[in-house]
């Protein structure tokens, strides 16, 4: 019996969190690990400890602690809901944190067109309390993510990068992807009778 780890890949406002919440409802014995929650917690309660530039060590450390705890002390499936757009970052997650001999590793790539994303950020009511540094809007975050496409490490996931890859191009793909993942959970980690 293997646990599933579902890792989202996509830009801001591509639907990762909405997808993760819907998946959690349908996938018994799972939880969402979303770094936006850690960012908001740190900005609310420990703002003075938040680094203003460079690596976000505090947020990543808190996230790692939560994931390690879930791995060692629960039998929950993990839904890792972050942008995960860095090829090296995904490689680390898939090979170091969630090795193939212990987990069924699933990538869900949100390939939503940029015009849709810009429309969504324009209408967004989400809290900006997850930001650090000079960001004041999700439009700025999306613009930065566009610029990062020029870096060789920011690439779309490919087949064989994980055990399974699902691509969501629009909201119509969400339900069928959730059903496929739930089916995989039943196949690889059946509930004890």
Label the model's feature ranges:
Residues 8:
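Hydrophobic anchor at the beta1->P-loop junction of P-loop NTPases
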Residues 11-12:
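The conserved Walker
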Residues 15:
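Conserved glycine(s) of the Walker
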Residues 18-71:
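Conserved substrate/cofactor phosphate-moiety recognition/catalytic segment
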Residues 58-102:
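Glycine-rich phosphate-binding loop used to anchor ATP phosphates in small-molecule kinases
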Residues 101-122:
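Conserved phosphate-donor/acceptor-positioning beta-strand/loop module used by diverse small-molecule
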Residues 127-178:
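Small-molecule kinase domains that catalyze NTP-dependent phosphoryl transfer to phosphate-bearing small molecules
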Residues 182-193:
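C-terminal accessory "lid"/substrate-recognition subdomains
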């Amino acid at each position: 019996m293997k646990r599933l780890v579902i890792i989202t890949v996509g830009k801001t406002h591509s639907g990762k969190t909405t997808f993760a919440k819907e998946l959690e409802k349908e996938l018994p014995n799972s939880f969402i690990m979303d770094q936006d929650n850690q960012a908001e917690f740190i900005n609310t309660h420990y703002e003075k400890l938040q680094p203003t530039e460079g690596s976000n060590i505090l947020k990543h450390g808190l996230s790692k602690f939560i994931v390690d705890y879930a791995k060692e002390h629960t039998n929950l499936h993990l839904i890792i809901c972050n942008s995960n757009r860095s090829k090296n970052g995904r490689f680390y997650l898939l090979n170091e944190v969630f090795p193939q001999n212990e987990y069924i590793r699933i990538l869900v790539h949100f390939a939503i067109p940029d015009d849709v994303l810009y429309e969504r950020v324009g209408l967004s009511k989400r809290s900006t309390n997850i930001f650090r540094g000079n960001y004041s809007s999700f439009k700025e975050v999306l613009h930065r993510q566009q610029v990062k496409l020029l870096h060789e490490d920011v690439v779309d996931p490919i087949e064989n990068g994980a055990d399974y890859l699902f691509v969501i191009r629009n909201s119509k793909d969400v339900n069928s992807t959730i059903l496929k993942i739930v089916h995989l959970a039943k196949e690889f980690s059946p509930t004890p009778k």
